[in-house]
C-alpha cells in the first residue's frame, strides 16, 4: 500500500545551514513552495570560528545594519599570526576584510529570512523515489529533493552508489562563551584583530577571537591524531603571548574528541 504523504511541497531542501537557507530564499522568491528540513532545532551551535567576508555578505544580500540589530557583527581589520619558536606577525588593512558572527545567530537569521516553510528537529530517515518524485520519511512528497546538509548530508549518503573518493579528514575543537569586558581586555585580543597560532607541522591552527561580548577559541587539524595534545600546545602558546590569562583558561571546558566536529574534504 502506498503511504499517504501528510505534506507536499514544490522543493524539499535537506539542511538549514547557510547554503540550504540561501537556496531556499531564492526559490521562494521565484514563487515556489519550499520546505526546509533539518535534524537540529534552531538556533543551534556550530563548530566554527565564525567570520564571513564582505563578498559573502554581498552575495547573501545581507543588510548589515538590519543584521547588527541585536546580533554580533564584528569588523575585522587585521590578523595576528604565530608559530611556536617564531615571532608573531601582525597584519593590518585600511578597511574591514571580514566580519565576525555567531553561527547560532547567523544561521538562524538566514533560515528565517528565507521565507520557506520549516520542519526543524526532524532527521531524514528514508527517501523513496516514486512517480517521478520523492517520498521522504513517509510523510513529505516533493518532485524536487535537494541535499544541502554539508559533508554528512543524508541525501548524499543515501543516494551515493559509487565508493566515496579519498578524502582528507579535518577535525576541530572550539568553544564560544560570553566574557566580560575585563576578561576580553585581559586576553590582550583586539576584537578587530583575531589571533592565529599555527601547529609546528603546519597541518592545522588554533585561533582566539573576540567578538561582541563573546570569545571564540578553537583549533582545527587535518587529522585527529593527538588532537588534544595539539590543542594544549596552542593554548600554551597563546597563554605565553598573554592572549588568554590563567583565570580565563580555567573557564574553558574543551569538548571531548568524540564531540569534536569532523569535516571530510576532498583534496581534489
What are these regions (language model features)?
Residues 11, 32-34, 145:
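Hydrophobic anchor at the start of a short beta-strand
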Residues 123-126, 223-268:
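FAD/FMN-dependent oxidoreductases across multiple families
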Residues 2-17:
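Beta1/beta-strand and adjacent pyrophosphate-binding region of the FAD-binding site
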Residues 43-80:
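N-terminal FAD cofactor-binding segment of flavoenzymes
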Residues 28-47:
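Glycine-rich FAD pyrophosphate-binding loop
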Residues 65-68, 75-158, 166-170:
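Conserved N-terminal helical subregion
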Residues 152-235:
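Conserved FAD-binding catalytic core of PHBH/FMO-like flavoproteins
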Residues 20-21:
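N-terminal Rossmann-fold NAD(P) dinucleotide-binding loop
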